[in-house]
């Protein structure tokens, strides 16, 4: 059991201080189901002040906070994009605590009152949205509270789902924010997250759909292979190159295909790297049908989860039962959360890309406006997971290298500043000596009569003061 302290601020300057603890079994890795979860305790303390900020007076009942981009998405690959939400509500003063057993969801929502609202705020609170996003944020949060209460309660009580939300907070305002959110989903995917997504995104449509921005246009059928037999896809294939770093560049992507009832069935597996240097394996089953008019197009539709649809376009292929066999796929997809994601992958029989087929691939990639040289090389060694001690040592070494690098960068900056200062002082000193030389030359060139006139013009400050009757401040002459 581990307790983590947290503190959040509500709309009316109420402060929630809470501790969340979870007891997890040690024999499983990121596989928290209801049967695995023993218990969790949330202790919440609310402190209230009398003054209510003007910003929240317009919505006295429900105040929803999101980050500057509004509602965030988190995904478990290109098909499973899901929402993370934060909810602020005005909560009365008091202390409340609760223990979550297996039937936590029913218990929480039967007693939907002070604790339930407090727990949601404690887990899902984010920064307040900008004024432009405030209306949409309020609609989303209101929809969740009204339509997805049960699913929300289950997410709160599930360690993986709660960890997913916490992970998302590290993505705010990053240049790779979307990619970061999707990686969070990859790490913490489970059935509870899926159930919440199904309600919030698909069934009740609380989450606005991300629009297609045209990054992956549909290719013209003329640039695709004109003949393709789905049976050629049968057997095991490795993905050795991928275009999209978010979806296509996982380690150990070994996919096995077979045909049944005029469909191509793919058993897909890949590895997700964990922050400690380990990994765990994900898997999925996908089914494709061939376009009756264009053999180079395969459709993966009619999926229940988020109603996702993937369209595969075969740019080039060579299947001759040799190590140089390959199938080059470009794809575009859509689901209830995101319309227009896409990418491209190269399937090869070999775990490593044969160099001899690269010219063909470069030509094929150019047909859809892509440069094959920019594709990412994947790691298909598929070795065992390193021992925990080795992984920890590696992380320590990485940390040491990071610190050394930062120190070296600081030293370089200090050296640059010092060099600039030395150069500046050197120039000032040279200028001062030049002025001295000018003065000496000037005095040397004066005649005796000119020197006498110059001496006669010299007046003491006290004499000037008397002359002007103390009307001038003497400090300006001294």
Swiss-Prot record:
GO terms for cellular component: chloroplast thylakoid membrane. It catalyses: all-trans-violaxanthin + 2 L-ascorbate = all-trans-zeaxanthin + 2 L-dehydroascorbate + 2 H2O. It is found in: Plastid, Chloroplast thylakoid membrane. Its EC number is 1.23.5.1. CDD domains: lipocalin_VDE. One of its GO terms (molecular function) is violaxanthin de-epoxidase activity. It is a peripheral membrane protein. InterPro entries: Calycin, Lipocalin_CS, VDE, VDE_dom. Residues 388-453 form a coiled coil. Keywords: Chloroplast, Coiled coil, Membrane, Oxidoreductase, Plastid, Thylakoid, Transit peptide. It holds the Pfam family VDE. One of its GO terms (biological process) is chlorophyll metabolic process. Gene3D superfamilies: 2.40.128.20. PANTHER family: VIOLAXANTHIN DE-EPOXIDASE, CHLOROPLASTIC, VIOLAXANTHIN DE-EPOXIDASE, CHLOROPLASTIC-RELATED. Belongs to the calycin superfamily. Lipocalin family. Part of the xanthophyll (or violaxanthin) cycle for controlling the concentration of zeaxanthin in chloroplasts. Catalyzes the two-step mono de-epoxidation reaction. Stereospecific for all-trans xanthophylls. Zeaxanthin induces the dissipation of excitation energy in the chlorophyll of the light-harvesting protein complex of photosystem II. This is Violaxanthin de-epoxidase, chloroplastic.
């Amino acid at each position: 059991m581990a307790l983590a302290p947290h503190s959040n601020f509500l709309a009316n300057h109420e402060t929630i201080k809470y501790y969340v603890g979870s007891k997890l079994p040690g024999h499983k890795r990121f596989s928290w189901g209801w049967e695995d979860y023993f218990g969790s305790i949330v202790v919440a303390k609310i402190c209230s002040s009398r003054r209510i900020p003007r910003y929240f007076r317009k919505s006295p009942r429900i105040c929803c906070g999101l980050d500057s981009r509004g509602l965030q998405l988190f995904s478990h690959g290109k098909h499973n994009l899901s929402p993370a939400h934060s909810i602020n509500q005005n909560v009365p003063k008091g202390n409340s605590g609760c223990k979550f057993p297996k039937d936590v969801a029913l218990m929480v929502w039967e007693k939907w009152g002070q604790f339930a609202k407090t727990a949601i705020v404690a887990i899902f609170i984010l920064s307040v949205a900008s004024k432009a996003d405030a209306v949409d944020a309020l609609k989303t949060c209101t929809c969740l509270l009204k339509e997805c209460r049960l699913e929300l309660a289950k997410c709160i009580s599930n360690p993986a789902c709660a960890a997913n939300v916490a992970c998302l907070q590290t993505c705010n305002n990053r240049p790779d924010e979307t990619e970061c959110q999707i990686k969070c989903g990859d790490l913490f995917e489970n059935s509870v997250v899926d159930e919440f997504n199904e309600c919030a995104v698909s069934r009740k449509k609380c989450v606005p759909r991300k629009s297609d921005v045209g990054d992956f246009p549909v290719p013209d059928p003329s640039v695709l292979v004109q003949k393709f037999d789905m049976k050629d896809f049968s057997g095991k294939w490795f993905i050795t190159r991928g275009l999209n770093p978010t979806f296509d560049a996982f380690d150990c992507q070994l996919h096995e295909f077979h045909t049944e009832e005029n469909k191509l069935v793919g058993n897909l597996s890949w590895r997700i790297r964990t922050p400690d240097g380990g990994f765990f394996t994900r898997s999925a089953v996908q089914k494709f049908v061939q376009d009756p008019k264009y053999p180079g197009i395969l459709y993966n539709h009619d999926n229940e989860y988020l109603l996702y649809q993937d369209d595969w376009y075969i740019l080039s292929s060579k299947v001759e039962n040799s190590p140089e066999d390959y199938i080059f796929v470009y794809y575009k997809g859509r689901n209830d959360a995101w319309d227009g994601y896409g990418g491209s992958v190269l399937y090869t029989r070999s775990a490593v890309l044969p160099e001899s087929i690269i010219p063909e691939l470069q030509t094929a990639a150019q047909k859809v406006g892509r440069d094959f040289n920019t594709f990412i090389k994947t790691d298909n060694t598929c070795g065992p997971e390193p021992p925990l001690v080795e992984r920890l040592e590696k992380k320590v070494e990485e940390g040491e290298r990071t610190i050394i690098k930062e120190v070296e960068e600081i030293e370089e900056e200090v050296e640059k500043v010092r060099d600039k200062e030395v150069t500046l002082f050197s120039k000032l000193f040279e200028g001062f000596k030049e002025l001295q030389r000018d003065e000496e030359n000037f005095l040397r060139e004066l005649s005796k009569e000119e020197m006498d006139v110059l001496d006669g013009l010299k007046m003491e400050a006290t004499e000037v003061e008397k002359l002007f009757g103390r009307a001038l401040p003497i400090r300006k002459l001294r």
